[in-house]
C-alpha cells in the first residue's frame, strides 16, 4: 500500500474499495499512540472493562404491551366482550411477539385466536413474523397453525398486518387487516379498520367454508386522555361470505350484523 497516498486511501475507503483495517503507509503518517504517554486504547485508568462497555440502543432489550381493543359489544339484543392486543419482548431487530383476539361473555371465553411469533425487522417500518397460531372455540375442536406474515406501517400511515397459515390436514388460511387514524383534533380522531379471512378448504366442524369466509369493517371515534389511555365508541359491520354464510344460515345464525361498541385502548 506504499503507492497509495493518504488522500487516495481515504477516497477508496469511503467508496468501499479499500478493506477495513488496511491503512495507507506514508513517511509522514503519525503514530496514533505517540502522545498517549505509552498507553494504548485498551489500557490505562480510563479504559472500559469489556463487561461495562457502552451498549448501543440496538443491543438493549425492551418490552411493550398494547391492548388495541377492550370493548363492550352489542348487536341484535345480545351483548358480549371483545379484546384484541399484542405484546412483545426483545431488541430493535428481533423480538418475541404475542398476539391475541377473542370474545367472551358471562365470564367464559367463547372463541379466541392466539399467536406466538418471532419478529424480525427487515426495514425501519416492516417486520416479518414466523411462529404458531392457536384457535379455540367453545364446543368446537381447536386448531393449530404454522404462521408466517408481515406487519408494519405502509406509506400514508396505514397500519397493515397480513399473515398466511398452514394447518394439519392440508388446511390453509390467510388473514389481512388494516387501520388508519384520521385526526380531527390533536386528541380526537376517527379510526376506520377492516379485517378479512380466507380459508383453503371447508372446515364444517367450525362452520367455516372455503374461500372468503368472513370480514368486518369498523369505525371508532377515539379520544386520547393520554397517549397511553384512549376511550372510544364506534360501530362495526360484520359479515360472512360464501360457504361460511350458507353454513350460518343452515344453523340459524346471522350472516350479517351491525355491532355497536364502547371500549378503551391502552399500552405501556
Per-segment meaning from a language model:
Residues 25-107, 120:
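Outer-membrane beta-barrel initiation region
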Residues 69, 98-102, 130-134, 162-166, ...:
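Transmembrane beta-barrel strands of outer-membrane/channel proteins
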Residues 89-91, 120, 152, 166, ...:
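Residue-level signature of outer-membrane beta-barrel architecture
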Residues 141-204:
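Detector for outer-membrane/organellar transmembrane beta-barrel domains
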Residues 219-224, 255-268:
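Outer-membrane beta-barrel "beta-signal"
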Residues 85, 116, 148, 176-178, ...:
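Membrane-embedded beta-strands of outer-membrane beta-barrel proteins
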Residues 61-63, 79-83, 110-114, 142-146, ...:
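Residues that define the transmembrane beta-barrel architecture of outer-membrane proteins
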Residues 93-98, 124-128, 156-160, 185-190, ...:
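Repeated loop/turn-to-beta-strand initiation elements of outer-membrane beta-barrel proteins
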Amino acid at each position: 500500500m506504499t503507492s497509495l497516498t493518504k488522500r487516495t486511501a481515504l477516497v477508496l475507503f469511503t467508496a468501499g474499495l479499500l478493506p477495513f483495517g488496511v491503512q495507507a503507509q506514508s513517511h509522514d503518517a503519525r503514530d496514533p499512540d505517540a502522545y498517549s504517554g505509552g498507553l494504548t486504547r485498551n489500557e490505562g485508568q480510563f479504559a472500559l472493562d469489556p463487561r461495562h462497555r457502552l451498549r448501543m440502543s440496538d443491543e438493549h432489550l425492551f418490552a411493550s404491551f398494547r391492548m388495541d381493543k377492550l370493548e363492550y359489544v352489542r348487536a341484535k339484543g345480545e351483548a358480549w366482550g371483545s379484546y384484541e392486543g399484542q405484546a412483545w419482548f426483545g431488541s430493535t431487530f428481533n423480538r418475541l411477539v404475542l398476539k391475541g383476539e377473542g370474545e367472551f361473555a358471562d365470564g367464559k371465553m367463547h372463541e379466541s385466536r392466539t399467536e406466538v411469533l418471532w419478529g424480525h425487522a427487515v426495514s425501519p417500518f416492516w417486520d416479518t413474523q414466523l411462529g404458531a397460531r392457536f384457535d379455540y372455540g367453545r364446543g368446537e375442536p381447536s386448531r393449530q397453525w404454522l404462521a408466517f406474515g408481515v406487519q408494519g406501517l405502509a406509506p400514508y400511515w396505514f397500519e397493515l398486518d397480513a399473515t398466511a397459515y398452514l394447518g394439519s390436514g392440508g388446511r390453509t388460511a390467510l388473514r389481512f387487516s388494516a387501520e388508519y387514524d384520521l385526526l380531527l383534533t390533536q386528541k380526537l380522531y376517527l379510526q376506520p379498520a377492516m379485517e378479512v379471512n380466507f380459508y383453503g378448504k371447508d372446515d364444517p366442524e367450525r362452520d367455516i367454508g372455503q374461500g372468503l369466509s368472513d370480514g368486518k369493517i369498523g369505525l371508532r371515534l377515539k379520544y386520547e386522555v393520554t397517549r397511553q389511555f384512549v376511550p372510544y365508541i364506534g360501530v362495526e359491520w360484520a359479515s360472512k361470505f360464501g360457504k361460511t354464510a350458507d353454513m350460518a344460515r343452515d344453523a340459524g345464525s346471522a350472516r350479517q350484523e351491525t355491532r355497536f361498541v364502547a371500549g378503551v385502548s391502552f399500552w405501556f
